[in-house]
């Protein structure tokens, strides 16, 4: 009996463990474990759990079309899998466990190790697969780039046409989907849902993006209103839960470019999109090497300044204004309100809101990261918490600069027609762009005055962060150890990325000029 343990790989297509476990119609037991520990965490957002449950429902529907079904067990994952193996052994069935690697914090690392140890002690086989690219043998970051593209170009795993799941009974806590909705109903209470879960929806979303929505992606992705309307892929929650693989997306975009023929602008947009996929997987790889980075500063020089400790009353007041979208900075507040309602923001707004909290408010990224994870439908520790450290000015200390976004300048650059601000901050609908930029609304509307002086806090707090970065750089240069080598590799990767972006843009302009 092949136990097929789904986790963040909730799909049948291009799923290594599904293809191998179901081969030759061997008996397969597909299962998902609803672990109460996960749903009790403060960082678990309702939008994300609802998306997960919808994805499980769709996975069950797709399995039933192949003659199978999804078993929902409830309890501690380690205990359930151990008890399931014992139950099958008592029935005279030797199970083999199939599951994909998932980059985890310490809880998940310990859980997977305990499960593998149990199966080894009982002379039971395990097959550990990959749901997306990950270097798992040794530290070969200098080879990561080439290995990543080799993986993405490999043939997709073909979904089986039938899955043989015998009728079995188990003395284990199980749930039906009706049970799931009733027992965890707090995650289903929201009426409107902006992102629907499931492999079927993932494929439809990818199809609509590649057919029409991708046009102009390279510049629309940083415009929050256009991104909200579908100018970005909206695939991030699907990739986070594995209802779609990055390899499927990569190969589909390459096929679309070939289908379109000589269209430089389309090719440029889709190349920009594929680059984002690579960055996403590189963040996952980093957490695999350094799981502690999910909760600790990358460099100890920042530990006194960026701490998860409870905020003092003044900073707590700033933090609450930031959370509620009541800072008096219109674009920032629109973005934070969008997050609470949709469970999503485009990348530029996530970064802008993060730098404002960390640099201008002087509040640790730990607090902001928890808030994001409470609401993001696509929340992923590997990406989100590393991005928070980037926006806090912690990463890439060998570079002499770090970004601090100006919320008002970004109104001119990213929302000059004010559609995004008017939608999320209706208090300002009576004001035009010059009036909003000049603060004409202050003390004349229900909208709050700015909670801080942006220019002053940028200067003062920006210098504090800059000085800490210099200390890190000086130490790394003096030590010339592994930390320095990794920092140098990181800086080289960032520099190479921007060089490649410049090169791609120049190639696009040359092709565009040649086609006239």
Map each language-model feature to its residues.
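Short catalytic/ligand-binding loop motif for oxyanion handling, primarily in non-cytosolic enzymes
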Residues: 12, 38-39, 81, 105-108, ...
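N-terminal beta-strand-loop-alpha-helix module at the start
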Residues: 1-69, 466, 475, 479-482, ...
